[in-house]
């Protein structure tokens, strides 16, 4: 059944049809160059309004902040200073730094204190920033590449892993990419590989092996992920397929979306 689906997708250029769904985002992003300040002010006011009745917003009078100059009365905080608030949120408290209950926390790598930091990821943040940003990236790519066959195959989306957050129901902590994969629109799962179970494996060596087996015979047209992680996967796929040319594995591959890190080393490798 999977082979039949792949053949159908490959034969028909569904990208031209699907691209029309991205037109509104293309028009919206076109305004960034000419209305950047007004758009930023609109977002600023919305953030102040949405956080006004949180503990933090009440403490610093977010309700009365309409201009950036007034925001300057809110002191700049280090992570260590807001960590107690974050910990309370991780234990399920509502309306602390953001309205309602935040269920997901992105775990950063150790930095200055060589300790991980836990960044609250709200539902609004997921949809209005992360998913919207992904949509915009695809929209701009399709706009600049009208002959693309992006949707004639599938996207290899590489992410990290997550784990339960304390014992709070439905709350997760882990790599941001894993949180995005966990909550992605089910329709996206129809055009991405590997499946969620493999994508969220915590053992990286096992993940690389299973991703290789699950994707090397698929028609992959696009890649998304951290360059260093993607490099490990692609190297293993090339090794298993017995080639040094990625085009022999996925002849229709056309674009790589980098989540973070330097793409240069990956581009030289593949």
Where are the predicted features?
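Nucleotide 5′-phosphate-binding alpha/beta core
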Residues: 1-107, 113-257, 264-268
